[in-house]
Each structure stands twice: as C-alpha cells, then as structure tokens.
Amino acid sequence: MTAEDSTRFKRAQWRFILCSMIAYAFFYITRKNLSMAQPEMLERGVITKEALGTILTVHGVLYGVSRFVNGFWADKLNGRIFMTIGLALSALMNFLFGCTSLTVLFAAFWIVNGWTQGMGFPPCAKMLTHWIHPKELATKMSIWNTSHSFGSAMALGLCSMLFALGMGWRWCFYVPAALAGLAAVFCFFCVKDGPHEDGLPELDLSDVRGKADGAERTVTDADRRRLVYRNHVIWLCALANFFVYVVRFGFLDWGPTFLKEYKGIDVSKGGLMIIAFELAAVVGTIFAGWITDKLFAGRGVRTCVFCMLFAGLCALGFWYLPNGAPIWQATLLLMGTGFFIYGPQALIGIVAAQQATNDAAAMANGFMGIMGYAATTVSGVGIALISKYLGWNAALLSIGGFALIGMVFFLFAWNAQATGYKKASA
C-alpha cells in the first residue's frame, strides 16, 4: 500500500467506523424503547408483567438465534445491504407495535423485531475485521461498540422527552420507527462493505497470519466451522457471555421499572439514571479496549476478568443500598455497573473476531450472540418472576451473583493468545 493509499485508507476507515456506528445505534433505538414504554403499559393495564417478561424472553432468544444464523450468511453476503434490510424491517415492526393494543400482536411484532435486530451486528463484525488490522482492533472496535450505549441512551432520552411532553407510550415506537427508516437509507448510501467499495486495497494481514496473505486464499464453510466450533476460547467466552448479558439486560430491560417500584423514582428520572448508566458504559467500553491493547497486548479475556469482578460488586452494592438512600448514591452504583459490564460486552465480540480471524468473524459473533441472548430466559421472564415473588432485593442479589459466575469462565480462558491467525494458518 502506497503512502497516498495509506492516508486515504485511514480516512475511509474512520468514515466507515463513524457511519456504521450511527447506523447500528438505530438498531438499539428500535429495541430499547420498550424498556421505557413498559412502565406506562403496565400501569395502564395494556399488558401484564408476566406477558411482558415472556415477550422479552422470546424476543431475546430469537434475537440470539437470528445473530447465529445471520452470522453464517453475513460472512458470505454484502454487509451494507444485509444491515440496511434489517434496520428497515425493524423500523416497520416498531411502527406496527405502536399501532396495536392486543397482547398477541405485541408478541408477534416484537418477536419478529427480535429476528430483524439480529441482522445488525453480524455484518458489522465482518466489516470491521476487513477495515481494521488485528493489532488495532481492540481499541478501535471498542470505540465502535459505544454505538450500543449511544443507541440505548438515545432511546431512553427520546422516550423521556416524549413522556415529558405528555405523549403516551405509543409515541415511543412511532418516533423511533421514523428515525430508523431514515437511518436505513443513510446506511445504504454511507456504510461500505469493505475497502474495495471505496476503491482501496484490502488489509495486508501477512504479519499476523505468519505467511504471505495471498489474495487467492479460498475459505470453505468447513474452514469457518473449524475456526469457530473447535476453539475452546470461543466456547468459554460464549458461556461467559450468557452471564454478561444477564447483568446487562437485567439493568437495561428492567431498570426504569425497578427504580419506580423499588425506589419510588418516577419513569422520567429513572430513564435519566439509566442514561447515566449508558454514558458510563461509553467510557468503560473505550477504557477496556485501550487497556486491552496497552496493558494486556490484545488479550481481551484478561480485561474481562477484572471488569466482571467490579461489575458484580457494583450490582451487589445496589442491592445493599438501603431504601431512602440519596438518589446520587444509586446513580453512582448504576454508573459503576455500566462502566464495568460494557467492557466484556464489547471485548467478547472482539475476542471472537480475533480468534476466528476475519474469515469467520461474523459466524463467531453469531455464536456469541445466541449464547448471550439465551440469557434473556433469565433477564426477561426470570427477573420478572423473581421480582414478583421474592422482591427486587432478591433480583438484584441474583444479578450480582451472575456477574461473578461469568468472571470464573473468563478466568478459565486467561492464557488465551491475542489472535487465532497463526493457528488458523498452521
């Protein structure tokens, strides 16, 4: 690559990172809006807590299955087009959800939304590994991963604003649907599948593959399956991911509800507290990626061990916090949980991509997705039942314990190498 090509590549790389971050954030806006709408839906008797918990669980499981299946296809197809279709369909499902009052249709539209949401991350994982060199991936992909937090914060902030303006829960679906439709158009025209779509040469990976990175390499489906399913590090991280997502969605899906029921904080203030959780997550995500590259030489699993430990302690601290404690104390503990839990959330995708190489990055992240979103069996209906029959104290204690279990799985993978490129080329 010439000096001129290198300069053009860096500009195009950051343009891709920014554009794909914006597009992916709108997947979250059309997913996390439900957590803000649900307190009013429950209060008005539009839906029961058990039905809502079941919908959240099935939605999450199907989302995980979708990421798994679409991970296979995203490695083969154009990521830009794949992502655009998923975002457009998510916008449609949100609009339809806002139009109905029947529980069966709530379930149908949100479950289909779970599938279309799974068309977002796998193509991004593939495209990122084609745009970013493995030696920079932890830092730059961690920056990209803040799109999760920005998207969630935008959903919470937007819905809080709509409630403050006196608009009902339906507008929490109409407005995000309209914005996501515009974002789908933006994605189609601005996100690039790889350097080739910008007229640039592909990344040279000969230094990490351990031999010439020939352009004529042929990768079969059997090769991709071997890279993913015969890698013990990917399996350990997938198991750990289950517990990462229990903690993450325990707070995201139920945060506004338990703050209202458990602490007596109204939905608007509770939404702002969860926004603080997400903003702390942005800082934590970037910090985790930076520490991984600078302190642990790209070994993201080691960063995850410490993050899960402190995330668990923060969650347990929230459980220990007495009723009537100042709201700023609860906010700080929420922010601490967000800061630490989003490190593993981002790094697991990076570790999967590094271990499976850019030949199977989408498939590996699809596998991570199905394991992570299987956690909604706990964070959805599980938390609903625990909070109903045992109270929010028991629910928060459980979330803290799950974080520490996840830490143990990461410990088993402590000695993992930073990437799987040399092993794949052997």
Feature-to-residue mapping (PLM):
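A late C-terminal transmembrane helix in Major Facilitator Superfamily
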Residues: 358-390
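Conserved MFS/SLC helix-loop-helix module at the cytosolic interface between two early adjacent transmembrane helices
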Residues: 65-104
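Helix-loop-helix hairpin linking two adjacent transmembrane segments in secondary transporters
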Residues: 144-195
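Extracytoplasmic gate region of multi-pass secondary transporters
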Residues: 34-36, 231-286, 345, 379
